Structures are given as structure tokens and as C-alpha cells.
Amino acid sequence: MFSKTLVVLAAVAAVTVNGLTAKECQDAFTGEVAKLTTGALPLVQPCSSDSGFSMVPPTGLPTDDQYVKMCASKNCKALLEFIKGAGLKDCELNFGSIFPGSVPLNVYQLGQGFDAKCESISGGGSTPTTAPPSGTTPTTPTTAPPTGTTPGVTPSPTTPKPAC
């Protein structure tokens, strides 16, 4: 547990900017270290085991396959709910100095976009359409537009345009 705490503290020291100044990112994460250490770290390994996504060290954003597994995992849902509620700022954590080959990860964006990503992967979010039951006719008559020409309107000649 001590090594994971050390990793989080080192990551906080390696915050990079995404829309905020480096100082704003540093200040925002410094205040959240204790909450992240005690609340998120116990869920990181179980979520990684469930999904195959490596958050520490990060190797990129989750793939669609990893998101499918994360969206189905109680551990990952709990982790992302905790992250969403932690009050983090929109900044990236850069683990590169600790874990060569890792990439910066914006934990805030990962948390905030999690539910929408799960919906898009599961096909949710679309509004179902309802059709009238088969064998029935609509109760409201429909009127087709008139065919032919409209009185008082003379159609203008058209000239074919050359193909591009």
C-alpha cells in the first residue's frame, strides 16, 4: 500500500496542464491526494483485473473492449464513481518519470466521460420508436401533396451543371 501511495504522490508532483495553469493543476491535485489514496487505490487493482485496463501506470485510454468490461464491472463502476465525486480538476497526471513508457492520463475526463461511453458502447441512449400495431390503420387521415403544377407558378427552366 505504501508503494501505491508513493506512486500517487509522485504523480501529483508530475501534473501537466490541460486548460489550467500548472499551478492550478498542482494545487487542485495536492488537496485531493488523501482522498484518492484512501478511496480510489483499493479499487484500482480489482478494476484492472476485471477489465484489463492499466490505470497505474497508464498506457493509454481504455479500448472499447476494455470499456465493455469496465462498464460491466462493479469494481470499475465504484472506482469511476469515486473519481467523479472527488472534485478533481481537468488536468493530466504524467507518470512518465516514474514509469517509463506510460502516458499522461486525465483522470477527471476518464471519470466524467465514463457513463456516456458505457451508454454508447451498450447501444443505449437512442430513443426507441413506436409503430402502430400491425393490422390497424391510422386514425388521422393523411393528405398527399398535389401532383402536377401549382396554379400561378411557372416553372423556370433548368440548365444541367457540368460534373466536377
UniProtKB/Swiss-Prot annotation:
UniProt keyword Heme, yes or no: no
GO CC entries: extracellular region
Source organism, top-level taxon: Eukaryota
UniProt subcellular location: Secreted
Family annotation (InterPro entries): Elicitin (IPR002200), Elicitin_sf (IPR036470)
SMART domains: Elicitin
Annotated region described as Disordered, given as residue ranges: 121-164
Annotated signal sequence range: 1-22
Keyword Secreted: yes
Keyword terms of this UniProt record: Disulfide bond, Hypersensitive response elicitation, Secreted, Signal
A single GO BP: symbiont-mediated perturbation of host programmed cell death
Gene3D superfamilies attached to this UniProt entry: Elicitin domain
Residue ranges, compositional bias (Low complexity): 127-156
Disulfide bridge map: 25-91, 47-76, 71-118
Summary of the function given for this chain in its UniProt record: Induces local and distal defense responses (incompatible hypersensitive reaction) in plants from the solanaceae and cruciferae families. Elicits leaf necrosis and causes the accumulation of pathogenesis-related proteins. Might interact with the lipidic molecules of the plasma membrane.
Protein family according to the UniProt entry: Belongs to the elicitin family.
Name of this protein: Elicitin-like protein 2
